[in-house]
């Protein structure tokens, strides 16, 4: 049994960096002790992903230039701390945060050192946001050190936009599902990664109501799909 990683929330845009650093070191040391190779980080300053009644698309946060600078500088510092223990930070672009869209991902990648800040590639969050995942995958392939395989139920996403629902409401309504159960075509994703030097994890994610989608059945469905499509 091996650990893939564990989420870490940064607040580099809204709080003193010392607060994030103090918590990050504890998290880093735990993951190092567990044998992980990467640390998933996501900036939660101004994030609305955990707010039940705030419309996801209407109220998405947008960073100021000063906040972008704080984020980039802070991530460089965390990247160095991670490397002290032989780990890498992988940045998780995420719905309801200041790094969600293609433009925002590109800005973050442009502002950060590839040697210190890697990227987590999440199919579900990119498609949910309306982005083209293959564009991000191809452009930043050398910087991608962690992959989340997540599918989308487009009909639920359409309702989220129409009714101005929050991220949590979207999840509860089934916006996400396992690979092969939604609208995302994974064939080229697997092909590109197979033909690259990618050595990281494929993490299957599908946050949804277990009363509606039996976790064991959906885990088997995802496993079968990946085996058939990727040969893994």
Q: Predicted regions span which residues?
A:
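Active-site beta-loop-alpha junctions enriched in small/polar residues
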Residues: 8-13, 44-46, 94-96, 122-126, ...
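A short alpha-helix capping/helix-coil boundary motif
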Residues: 5-8, 56-59, 86, 167-171
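Active-site acidic/histidine proton-transfer and metal-coordination neighborhood
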Residues: 16-119
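N-terminal entry module detector
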Residues: 1-26, 232
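Histidine-acidic metal/acid-base catalytic patches
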Residues: 80, 102-118, 127-232
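Hydrophobic faces of well-ordered beta-strands that scaffold small-molecule active sites
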Residues: 3-8, 39-41, 89-91, 117-121, ...
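Short amphipathic alpha-helical segments at helix-loop
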Residues: 12, 59-63, 90, 171-174, ...
